[in-house]
């Protein structure tokens, strides 16, 4: 880990390289929630790209020694390599808008010398509520509590966030 961040130095190198390549992406899911202070633990980091064919993705992979594995049948494309083994590529996010619409619903989170876009907690909650899978239902109470606590600590966030937290 790096300075209390939930990423190894190798993972940070890949995220930094994506930003250097000007790849439009955001971190979503429980990793995004954890970066906002929610008490979440997850093994994988879900990345949502504006354009999965952006050449900067493969350039960033090459720079850190990673490999692009194309999609096969119903499986989405994947990354392989020490720097990228815990990153998942998300092609579709249910219950919220498309990438361009949701870009306005992100926060810039500093990660030691650079920042990444992270989907806001209320939008993560909306997506998980829509999916309604057992694993999502299990984390929704904690996500909602975290969202309320964050708003209580920073009341200005209540004006920004339009998602219903109850």
Label the model's feature ranges.
Residues 1-166:
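Compositionally biased terminal segments of proteins
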């Amino acid at each position: 880990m790096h300075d209390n961040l939930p990423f190894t130095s190798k993972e940070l190198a890949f995220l930094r390289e994506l930003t250097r390549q000007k790849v439009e992406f955001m971190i979503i899911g429980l990793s995004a929630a954890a970066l906002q202070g929610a008490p979440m633990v997850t093994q994988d980091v879900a990345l949502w790209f504006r354009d999965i064919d952006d050449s900067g993705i493969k350039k960033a992979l090459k720079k850190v020694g990673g490999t692009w594995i194309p999609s096969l049948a119903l499986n989405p494309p994947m990354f392989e390599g020490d720097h990228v083994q815990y990153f998942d590529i998300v092609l579709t996010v249910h219950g919220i808008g498309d990438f361009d619409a949701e870009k306005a619903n992100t926060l810039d989170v500093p990660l030691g010398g650079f920042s990444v876009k992270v989907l806001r907690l209320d939008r993560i909650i909306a997506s998980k509520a829509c999916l309604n899978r057992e694993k999502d239902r299990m984390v929704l109470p904690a996500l909602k509590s975290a969202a309320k606590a964050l708003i209580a600590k920073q009341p200005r966030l209540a004006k920004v966030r339009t998602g219903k937290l109850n």
